[in-house]
């Protein structure tokens, strides 16, 4: 019994930033099987939540970040978080990013991986496991 409590306390934390509610709920249901999940639906909320958790000493281990959010682009969010000694970021998009943008994001280590929608749920679990 004690080890299971320890396992729960030591679960990794994954944040999902997705402005489409159905996808946000779907991704979180899959990831909640293995991780503690924080759901946000805008770039501003993502940055705010990251800063709040960091200030409380409750770091987020991985961020799944949609590229095209209602209030800003995912690459801008990724850059801001990485400049604050950020976390590992997986960028997700229904759009194929142009090569110069992808190259900049990878070369400057703003993101660890890029996933193109539609994404299979087992792919999300696999990518999360590889990243953290």
Each predicted region: which residue ranges?
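Non-catalytic signal-transmission and effector/linker regions of two-component phosphorelay proteins
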Residues: 1-15, 21, 51, 120-132
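Two-component/phosphorelay signaling modules centered on CheY-like receiver
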Residues: 21-39
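Acidic, metal-coordinating helix/loop segments flanking the phosphotransfer/catalytic sites
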Residues: 41-62
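Acidic catalytic/metal-coordinating carboxylates
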Residues: 42, 73-76
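Active-site residues of response regulator receiver
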Residues: 66
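The feature encodes the CheY-like receiver
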Residues: 70
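Short amphipathic alpha-helix used as the core "switch/output" element in two-component signaling
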Residues: 75-87
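Hydrophobic/aromatic residues positioned on beta-strands within the core alpha/beta folds
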Residues: 92-94
């Amino acid at each position: 019994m004690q080890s299971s409590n320890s396992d729960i306390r030591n679960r990794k934390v994954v944040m999902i930033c997705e402005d489409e509610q159905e996808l946000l709920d779907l991704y979180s249901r899959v990831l909640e099987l293995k991780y503690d999940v924080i759901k946000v639906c805008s770039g501003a909320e993502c940055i705010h939540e990251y800063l709040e958790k960091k200030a409380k000493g409750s770091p987020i281990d991985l961020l799944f970040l949609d590229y095209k959010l209602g209030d800003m682009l995912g690459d801008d969010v990724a850059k801001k978080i990485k400049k604050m000694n950020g976390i590992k970021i997986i960028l997700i998009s229904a759009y194929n990013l142009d090569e110069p943008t992808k190259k900049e994001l990878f070369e400057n280590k703003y993101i660890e991986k890029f996933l193109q929608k539609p994404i299979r749920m087992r792919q999300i679990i696999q990518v999360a496991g590889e990243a953290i």
